[in-house]
Amino acid sequence: MTEATGIVGEFLTLKEGTDADLLAMQCGDFYEFFAEDAEIVADELDLKVSQKSSHGSSYPMAGVPVDDLTPYVSALVERGYRVAIADQHETENGHAREITRVVTPGTHLETGDESAQYLAAVVREASRDSGDTYGIAATDVTTGQFQVTQLDDADAGEALTELYTFGPAEILPGPELRNDDEFLDRLRERTDAALTLHDSASFEPGRASHTVREQFGSETVDSVGIGDQNVAVRAAGAVLSYVEDTGVGTLAAVTRLQAYGERDHVDLDATTQRNLELTETMQGDSSGSLFDTIDHTVTAAGGRLLQQWLQRPRRNRAELQRRQSCVAALSEAAMARERIRETLSDAYDLERLAARATSGSADARDLRAVQETLALLGQVADAVTETERLAESPLADALDGADREAADSLAAELDSALVADPPGTVRQGGLFKRGHDDDLDEIIDEHEAALEWLETLPDREKERTGITHLSVDRNKTDGYYIQVGKSETDAVPEKYQHIKTLKNSKRYTTPELDEKERDVLRLEERRHDMEYEHFQRLRARVAEHATLLQDVGRTLAELDAFASLAVHAVENDWARPAVVDGNELSIEAGRHPVVEQTTEFVPNDLYMDDDRQFLIVTGPNMSGKSTYMRQAALITLLAQVGSFVPARSATVGLVDGIFTRVGALDELAQGRSTFMVEMQELSNILHSATEESLVILDEVGRGTATFDGISIAWAATEYIVNSIQSKTLFATHYHELTALGEELPTVENVHVAVDGEPRSAGSDGDVTFLRTVRDGPTDRSYGVHVADLAGVPEPVVDRSQAVLDRLRDDKAIEIRGSEQNDGGTTQAVFDLDSGQFRDGAAQSGGAAAGSTAEPVATDGDPEHAPGEAAAEGPKGDERAASLDSETEAVLSELTELDVNETPPVELMAKVQEWQAELDDE
């Protein structure tokens, strides 16, 4: 291949020196992409491709204007590309270009997304004796936040859950995780984050510790308690190293180090956040999510903070009570609340403006936005102090956290310097007010006097020459010129020097005009240079106050989030919950916070404590079982956000995690069936939940055969009750499980009530779903009735009801057996009342198997508990003879299996093994 020279050669040389996916190189007023990069960018952004010749070869070229680079780079980063930027600057020998930054998903300052934009690193240190130790660090370079934690004696699931709470845009796996395919696969499944392999040396303990202490100071590192947490420090050092490597000046914005422990936040894994639809619905839309429902914020920072609160609920009761008190005060001070919200609606995003200032990318409009927002702090403070209810609340203390005097001083400095509406570019002048600097004022006066001379020149020349069609203008080619209409060119003075002829006019210059042009250009350049120098100093002053901007921005964001929660509480009649230690969960007239916005909602009570830990929820299809359980989880979550809740009253015992197995999300695209996903989610819950957790289980086991499903559901229930002891709500159509309410002391049954008679063969029935939850079990699901409501053809509905009635009358289900010589199939029939097999019976063509049931006697005979083989009846020998060897082997294993002593996941695997054996016969 011919070696390129010139601009293309320079581009290719720079590209070889970076590991970025794409390179944008400034060439004058454009950023250009060459060669393969040009083809990629053109395809992704629909740009026109031209050709650039170099050393006998032709290279594709695509470009974007300098002023339009940001949106194009943002689009590329959103598509997963890492884009290097090579800026052009002047030297004594002409132009020079160098890579100044690499824009990646986790280091993108100019993002248009108002939500947090986290870059995270995860490190693992293996342990032979117990669980591993994980270090996790995450920073949002757009706001300067930096958070770090260490998980001791943890597993991969806990680390992944912790990572997911940040919703990172980019993740740096530590060296020991890069070859762990299982971990990386799970990481890809749970997040959309880009995975980047950063320099392994940056993860080394010594180097990482030096990097962290250099950035934040040894005193800060030790005071937040991570000085001796080597694994956490390794992750933190890698994040800081990556930020420094990818962006000049970006690291200066990272000033707020926060360390948190494992007990600071509620565990919300990816499955739970999805199932509870915290920030987006199951369909992937933000509209209709919990955040969308309760978000009444008027600032970007306030909305971002409220979303973070939802995704990372707290376990600190004092902090939750502080938040509740702020919401309560604003709820009771309507006029002051609206005054504050109206003031905040004029606020800009100070946290992100601070990051832009420290990185050197802030323009004059950004600094004016800083000034205007800092000035609002005093107005908000006045609204609080002038309202007795607010002045006596923690809101007053929150405002004390921001240095109002320093904020007022910086705001005054910026206001005295900048014009009210500065231009968008900082190189074209017009940024500063008169009086900011005497030398600058003198240059501005001279420049504007020269411009005024030019502005009045046409009138003077018309009067002097008598020419009516005369104007003065300027362009890049001709500079300043006098233009005269063709009909009057004979009247031009002799000193007019002709420079160009057009169709209807001619252009001239004069010695005076040439001299004045030189003066204007000289003064213009001097003015622009001086203004830019002053602007750089002013921007540096703002950057020095980055921590102040972040503090004020955080304060205003908190006020906005509190006001948003107060607005929603007042408009929807929400109540302040009592947040307590212990396992009590008491909800009076609770409602679902999202569903109640669109549907007339029937409130329901819920009570759980140490003696009532596990609720089995039964009831018809479409009756509201899932909604009832979700609202319990959401009320708990909202209480641990610090919000009021949709209920008449509520007492919420603090939980350490909320875990859900809800719905039937099929992930066939990843090669996993609905049932496999369900079992993996159940496995995660059984491994992760503790006695302080809240667990929501919806229809566990329904994705497989009936016996398998009941066995798994039964065993999981026993395991949770006996081993984990977490508060659990379990909705099921396996009515056999309700027997556990009599056998296990902390298990209770509740059901969603129905009014009327169910449909039966020959009768339409009349059923009303009351949506009311009552104590005790139910034994009907009304599935055929729901099928009728859904519009299933009447013959199918009628036949379904007839089959259902027969099964109920017979109280038996039939199990597949061995083939007979006549082509029929012998069925092993299991009697639901006796808990024993009946005589085998041949049926031509093979009768359909029944639809439900665990082999358990309905009279509660303890000899026939789930997982144990029914006692052999008088016809036991005949039954054995009628079954094939595979079925008999499975029954034999089932007889010997102790369900109570078998872990649920192992039991699940055994059931799947039996199912495979029977399917293969």
UniProtKB/Swiss-Prot annotation:
Q: Does the keyword DNA-binding apply?
A: yes
Question: SUPFAM superfamilies from the entry?
Answer: DNA repair protein MutS, domain I, DNA repair protein MutS, domain II, DNA repair protein MutS, domain III, P-loop containing nucleoside triphosphate hydrolases
Q: Name one GO molecular function term.
A: ATP-dependent DNA damage sensor activity
Q: Name one GO biological process term.
A: mismatch repair
Q: Which superkingdom, per the lineage?
A: Archaea
Q: What does this protein do?
A: This protein is involved in the repair of mismatches in DNA. It is possible that it carries out the mismatch recognition step. This protein has a weak ATPase activity.
Q: Which family does it belong to?
A: Belongs to the DNA mismatch repair MutS family.
- Protein name, as recorded: DNA mismatch repair protein MutS 1
Lineage start: Archaea, Methanobacteriati, Methanobacteriota, Stenosarchaea group, Halobacteria
